[in-house]
Regions:
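Loop-helix junctions at membrane interfaces
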Residues: 1-206
Length: 206
């Protein structure tokens, strides 16, 4: 395969991953019900794109993930959408520039870090399954940990007020979200990334 052909194929793959992210973000396909919790799966195409296409493509897909989050939280907001959109306000609380940081930075990193984790693990582990699963878990936790902690840093009191908690209970509520949403999401991401990633690596090349 010559360089031009590979570049064209990579662009097609990137467009497919981008399309999947958009569809998942706008439909229930981006969420898996786990009892009382809905696990977000939109970051999984970002992780897979990073592993298959490289960190630059992963960063672009992560940026798209952030953009879809911004659009959804602006057009169909929830009580805490001000943490993701500077164009939404709740009572006297408005989103601002930090909302964009929360919306984009963690998601872009989700598209960068798995590429390097996978390459590093492949030097130690011959099988693809474990490195893929680890990348899925780590990529998902990067998103959850960064988003929730940045919310606490920049919007802690406002977020707590919207959730009906205050004072020391705010960070406990943050930790509760990480435990009840973040960990199940990471497990789901690990399983799907390993299963789908093995097929894509086999038929789509590395």
């Amino acid at each position: 395969m010559n360089h031009a052909t590979k570049k064209t194929q990579d662009m097609v793959k990137l467009a497919l991953f981008a399309g999947i992210i958009v569809v998942m973000s706008m439909t229930p396909l981006g969420y898996i019900p786990l009892g009382a919790v809905k696990a977000t799966t939109i970051h999984i195409p970002v992780i897979l794109g990073s592993i298959l296409l490289g960190w630059k493509a992963g960063a672009a897909l992560g940026g798209l993930f952030g953009l879809t989050s911004l659009i959804v939280n602006t057009l169909t907001p929830s009580l805490t959408s001000f943490t993701f959109s500077p164009f939404y306000s709740l009572g006297g609380v408005s989103g601002n520039g930090w909302s964009l940081v929360i919306c984009f930075v963690p998601r872009i990193l989700v598209g960068i870090i798995p590429y390097f984790v996978f390459r590093g693990l492949k030097k130690l582990i011959k099988s693809d399954t474990v490195p893929l699963a680890v990348c899925g878990f780590i990529g998902s936790m990067i998103n959850t940990l960064l988003v929730m902690n940045l919310i606490y840093v920049f919007f802690g009191e406002s977020w707590g007020s919207a959730r009906g908690v205050a004072g020391d209970l705010i960070y406990k509520a943050i930790l509760a979200v990480i435990a009840t949403n973040g960990i199940p999401e990471a497990i789901v991401a690990a399983l799907i990334t390993a299963a789908v990633g093995k097929v894509l690596l086999k038929f789509g090349g590395r």
